[in-house]
Amino acid sequence: MKKLALLPLALAGMFSATAAQADDGLFTGDVRLACEAVLCLSSGTRPSECAPSLKRYFSISHKKLSDTLKARRNFLNLCPAASQDEKMRQLVNDISNGAGRCDAASLNASLMVWNWDSDVRIVSNAMPSYCTAYNDNAY
């Protein structure tokens, strides 16, 4: 009978130990992916460890570009470090406006001007302001 009375206590001890072990201070879920995305999109290289967070970030898509950019900014703001100071808030804003839109292929497509009179296509060399902010961010 005493063994049956101790069973709930043993089970409770096991589950509390498991819960304490799971709370090791590491982020999980979208918070983890958001923090990883901030790090990956802030660096000049994209290692393979960035794939899940970048996939999640770039999978955010809405009908209007402004809605997509706002949703991506909101996703990055899930990371607690994203709002630690004004420079980080500006970095998140610059990332959400520039990431995926400032590579060579995107710029060539968006900055191409076609002259229908002479059938000549010209790519402007003026960098958009969102790319300048993204590339020149203090972080």
Predicted features, each with a name:
Residues 28, 33, 43, 72, ...:
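Residue-level signal for mature regions of secreted extracellular proteins and peptides
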Residues 52-74:
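Active-site-surrounding "flap" and adjacent substrate/cofactor-binding loops of secreted or lumenal enzymes
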Residues 81-139:
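Low-complexity intrinsically disordered segments
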Residues 20-23:
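Boundary of Sec targeting at the N-terminus
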Residues 8-14:
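Bacterial N-terminal signal peptides
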Residues 26-56:
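Short N-proximal segments of mature Sec-exported proteins
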Residues 1-7:
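Bacterial N-terminal signal peptides that target proteins for export
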